[in-house]
């Protein structure tokens, strides 16, 4: 990671999101809704990622869709289910925040951005005590991603594909000031930002990092969308 001050970039945005999967698109929509100037960078020519490989089921506690389905659920129930399922090893504050925002996030995706979700009322996911899961009609994550990409486009958020982020910059204070990306023709471009959101998966596709941080899983097979996530290592 190299040093570069924010004032030296020819092009800069307020919020820069790396990754145009469900996480990145949702983050971009939220930041845009808060009044920020947002840009999304996607490594692939066509966004897909793990979202498109998944069944697209999203857990939530206390959504309006659950209430319409007659399901008595709440954020506290989801929080406790997640805590027990993780055998108490999860970060309690993160679980609390995620569960607490889950219901309103589902409502927001459906009502503000047209994501076609419904509550799966006849299925209780293993480890859950009530039907927390929401999904699209096809039960495929690709359908959710298509609707999120449409919402990003409808809001006029810039989404640049075939843009592989290869390095991060920080200023003298240590704050991230921008990124370096590489285009398919090999040309490098630098882009400044006030806030950087890395929504480009974890490091499951990077055997070196798995061996370092989760040595007991060093020999495990990874079946997700391949990313090495050097961005995490750079940070």
What does each model-identified segment do?
Residues 7-23, 39:
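Beta1/beta-strand and adjacent pyrophosphate-binding region of the FAD-binding site
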Residues 184-187, 191-235:
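Glycine-rich loop(s) and the adjacent beta-strand/alpha-helix scaffold that form part
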Residues 27-28, 106, 233:
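Generic hydrophobic/aromatic pocket-lining and core-packing "Φ" positions
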Residues 24-27, 206-207:
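Short glycine/serine/threonine-rich phosphate/pyrophosphate-binding segments
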Residues 31:
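Aromatic pocket-lining residues of Rossmann-like dinucleotide-binding sites
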Residues 2-7, 36-37, 43-158, 164, ...:
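Conserved N-terminal/central alpha/beta ligand/cofactor-binding core
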